[in-house]
A protein has these predicted regions:
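Catalytic domains of cell-wall/extracellular-matrix polysaccharide-remodeling enzymes
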Residues: 72, 94, 118-255
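Sparse, context-dependent recognition of short Cys/His-centered cofactor- or disulfide-binding micro-motifs
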Residues: 15, 21, 32, 42-46, ...
């Protein structure tokens, strides 16, 4: 059974490994991961993948330029009973409102991919905020629903991009499995990219209008299904509760350290 993973409260920091080890030694008697994290100099990171033992992963599509393939993509996903996340640029949503509505009606999740697809790391905090809000307003005017996930265009970000997006109520999401479909290397290359190393909690990246997506996607879905994976939208993959993000962008639950037991006390039983 797949557990629901919504409304996560993320400790949105990355812990340098050496610093983390030092802190763990210094604070070995203290309880709780958040206390450790607060003591460490950190930087902002998006979520690249999730730490889970469940055989679940998320497929995501970025849509910025054309509508080619999008209807057939939805048909393929329907055939495999798969729901995914589409990160939409504002001008794409404005140009193709029918596709946005159809995506939602078929059960797919919509994420924010900026209003104009700029290089976000080159923008000021105010400009980043404007990009997020314009895209959000456009999507909401079409779907009636707010967006809660953000993916920076080109995968480019800095601390300000991640920080501002989270101040705006978004979880900033990247990917750790890249189909490289934008390189047009062929169907076999895409399939290999997406199947050569698959792990629970992966987030896979595609683009809706890539040249070989219609040929490659069914084979990739077949592979995941036969390997026993359940494919879910990104928001359902994200962990629920207090979380932290490691140096590689993997999201983890904050598991508190067990309280010391009084001397002579019986060990807890399952």
């Amino acid at each position: 059974m797949i557990k629901k993973r919504l409304d996560s409260r993320t400790v949105r920091r990355v812990l340098p490994v050496a610093a983390l080890l030092a802190v763990c030694m210094a604070y070995a008697s203290m309880r709780g991961a958040p206390a450790l994290m607060a003591a460490v100099a950190t930087r902002e990171l998006p979520v690249y993948n999730v730490d889970t033992e469940e055989k679940v992963l998320a497929i995501s599509f970025d849509a910025a330029w054309g509508r080619a393939n999008t209807e057939e993509l939805m048909n393929i996903l329907d055939r495999y009973d798969v729901k995914t996340t589409f990160f939409l640029v504002g001008f794409w949503a404005e140009k193709y409102p029918d596709l946005v509505q159809e995506l939602v009606s078929r059960g797919h999740e919509i994420g924010n991919h900026s209003a104009t697809h700029p290089h976000m790391a080159q923008l000021s905090a105010a400009q980043i905020r404007e990009e997020l809000r314009k895209c959000s307003d456009l999507v909401k005017s079409i779907t009636g629903k707010p967006t809660t996930l953000f993916r920076p265009p080109y995968g480019e970000y800095n601390d300000t991009v991640v920080k501002v997006s989270r101040e705006e109520g978004y979880e900033c999401v990247q990917w750790n499995v890249d189909s490289l479909d934008w390189k047009n290397l062929g169907t076999e290359s895409m399939v290999k990219q997406c199947t050569q190393s698959v792990n629970p909690g992966d987030i896979v990246l595609f683009h809706n209008d890539s040249k070989y997506i219609l040929e490659a996607l069914p084979r990739i879905l077949e592979y995941y299904t036969q390997a026993g994976y359940k494919i879910i939208p990104v928001s359902q993959l994200l962990l629920q509760g207090e979380t932290w993000i490691d140096h590689a962008g993997q999201q983890h639950l904050c598991t508190p350290t067990p309280a010391p037991q009084p001397e002579g006390a019986a060990a807890p039983t399952a």
